[in-house]
């Protein structure tokens, strides 16, 4: 299992390679708030790249509640996952919609399972790599036997990282 980061904005992440179990990663990552130091310690592979973002970090507005069913970024044909009947609840539909909402234009993200997002973007050379965790990143988890998971970093405050998420066949929206 490994976690990688896609960055929406001029904010970056870089962590060292660590060996961990899936159980410990999920236990740490999906707690209410995760310390940046703990998150660093539990990652096996982590990399990041940066997207150009229209909104700067100063104007970034964290999403701490579910988008309404009338929000066009999540619940319309603007969202490719919604368009092809893979909409909410679904982590990829949510993260795609959130990226669209942040950027204000269509994101250059994979239309496939979450585990393919990082490699797709890296292979196409869309984004730069960085070093410091900030808001707007898309965390990408990949593990054996599943389609992976993606979530969006909404806050990094006092060493705590807050992610917004959705889950396939699960919750439409939740924070971790």
Predicted regions and their residues:
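Secreted/periplasmic proteins that engage bacterial cell-wall peptidoglycan
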Residues: 58-166
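Hydrophobic alpha-helical targeting segments used for export or membrane insertion
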Residues: 30, 34-35, 39-51
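Ser/Thr- (and often Asn-) enriched beta-sheet segments in non-cytosolic proteins
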Residues: 14, 160-162, 174
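Sec-dependent signal peptide cleavage junction
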Residues: 45-63
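Bacterial Sec-dependent N-terminal signal peptides
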Residues: 1-35
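A short macromolecule-binding patch
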Residues: 170-176
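Beta-strand-connecting loop/turn residues
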Residues: 11, 41, 158-159
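Composition-driven, intrinsically disordered low-complexity tracts enriched in small residues
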Residues: 23-27, 55-57, 88
């Amino acid at each position: 299992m490994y976690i990688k980061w896609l960055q929406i904005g001029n904010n970056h992440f870089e962590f060292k390679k660590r060996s961990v179990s899936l159980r410990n990663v999920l236990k740490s990552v999906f707690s209410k708030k995760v310390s940046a130091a703990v998150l660093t310690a539990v990652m096996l592979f982590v990399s990041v790249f940066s997207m150009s973002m229209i909104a700067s970090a100063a104007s970034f507005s964290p999403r701490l509640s579910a988008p309404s069913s009338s929000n066009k970024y999540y619940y319309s044909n603007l969202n490719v996952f919604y368009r092809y009947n893979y909409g909410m609840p679904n982590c990829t539909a949510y993260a795609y919609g959130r990226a669209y909402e942040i950027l204000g234009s269509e994101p250059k993200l994979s239309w496939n399972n979450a585990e393919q997002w990082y490699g797709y973007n890296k292979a196409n050379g869309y984004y730069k790599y960085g070093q410091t965790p900030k808001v707007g990143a898309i965390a990408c988890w990949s593990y054996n036997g599943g389609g992976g998971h993606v979530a969006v970093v909404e806050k990094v405050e006092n060493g705590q990282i807050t992610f917004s998420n959705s889950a396939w066949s699960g919750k439409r929206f939740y924070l971790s």
